[in-house]
Amino acid sequence: MSPPWKLFADHLRLTVRLTPNGGRDAFDGIETGSEGETYLKARVTAIPEKGKANKALIALVSKSLGVAKSSITLVSGETARKKILRIEGDPEDLAKKLETLSG
């Protein structure tokens, strides 16, 4: 199973499946979708209204990886459960942190 992130020269792209209004802000491991794609499962307490859940996801990723919120950009999936995040920084270091988070 390939990880739900891809390394680039100066950033990492992370695929996430977000559950808004999920009772707590946390990651729930890596899952493989029906089409074989992998994603990091995340849940946030925020509701999916006016970008609140997306902001909560960025805050969760920022805190968990120890990076600034401003270094995380939502590339796609603004109104979908499946999202792609661009995270600026050392991609190797970010990948190691994600491996630890995803169990």
UniProtKB/Swiss-Prot annotation:
Domain of life: Bacteria
Any one Pfam family match given in the protein's UniProt record, by short name: DUF167
The family this protein is said to belong to: Belongs to the UPF0235 family.
Protein name: UPF0235 protein RHECIAT_CH0004196
Source lineage: Bacteria, Pseudomonadati, Pseudomonadota, Alphaproteobacteria, Hyphomicrobiales
